[in-house]
From Swiss-Prot:
This is Large ribosomal subunit protein bL36. One of its GO terms (molecular function) is structural constituent of ribosome. It comes from the Bacteria. GO terms for cellular component: cytoplasm; ribonucleoprotein complex; ribosome.
Amino acid sequence: MKVRASVKKMCDKCRVIRRHGRVMVICSTPKHKQRQG
């Protein structure tokens, strides 16, 4: 899980979602998981 100020899709499988007011990226590649901090 990467925590960064700007979350972006890193590949075609990445999905940008909102959970509990946080912007997150979920992906089948574990390396691509991000959340906004």
